[in-house]
Regions:
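Enzymes that bind and transform nitrogen-containing heteroaromatic metabolites
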Residues: 1-151
C-alpha cells in the first residue's frame, strides 16, 4: 500500500473498526518516501525504494503471496510492469471523494457507507446497496465523524 492508504487503514485499525483486526497480524509493506519510521501499525515495514523494483526483488526472493490495498498509483505501476498475477476485487465501504490522491469519485465528498443489502447474480455480479454518511474529514482520522445530517 502507499502512504495515503496506510494513513486511512491504520486509522481504522487504531479505532478498532470491524475487519481490521485480521490485518493487524499480517505482514504489511508501505511504499512511501514521505512517511518515517517507526510506523504505528503492527507488522508494517516501510520501503522507500521504488515500488516496482522492490516488488520485483521480493518476488525473486520467493515471496509469492502479495496483495495491494487501495493505492491506485501503486496498482497501476505494478500492472504496467507485469508484476500482477491475479486480480482479487474487494469492495471496501468508504469513498474518498475529496481526500483521495487519485479520485475515482472526483467531486464527491468523503463518505462512509453502511451496507444494507447485497445480492449476487450469476455468481459474477454483485449488487451492493449502501446508506451513505458524509464525513466531516478524511476517513480514518479524528475528524471522520459524520457531518451534521445527511441521511
Amino acid at each position: 500500500m502507499g502512504a495515503t492508504t496506510y494513513r486511512v487503514m491504520s486509522g481504522f485499525a487504531a479505532k478498532g473498526e470491524p475487519g481490521t483486526d485480521s490485518l493487524a497480524g499480517m505482514s504489511k509493506v508501505v511504499f512511501s518516501t514521505t512517511l518515517r519510521e517507526p510506523l504505528s501499525w503492527a507488522n508494517t515495514q516501510l520501503v522507500s525504494q521504488e515500488p516496482v523494483e522492490a516488488v520485483r526483488e521480493m518476488k525473486e526472493k520467493g515471496l509469492k503471496s502479495m496483495r495491494t490495498i487501495g493505492s491506485l498509483t501503486l496498482c497501476r505501476s505494478l500492472l504496467r510492469a507485469g508484476l500482477v498475477d491475479r486480480f482479487r476485487v474487494v469492495t471496501f465501504p468508504v469513498i474518498t471523494g475529496s481526500s483521495g490522491r487519485e479520485r475515482i469519485y472526483d467531486g464527491y465528498p468523503d463518505v462512509a457507507l453502511e451496507m444494507i443489502s447485497s445480492r449476487t447474480f450469476d455468481r459474477r455480479i454483485q449488487l451492493l446497496e449502501y446508506v451513505p454518511t458524509i464525513l466531516a474529514g478524511p476517513p480514518g482520522t479524528t475528524q471522520s465523524t459524520p457531518a451534521s445530517t445527511n441521511r
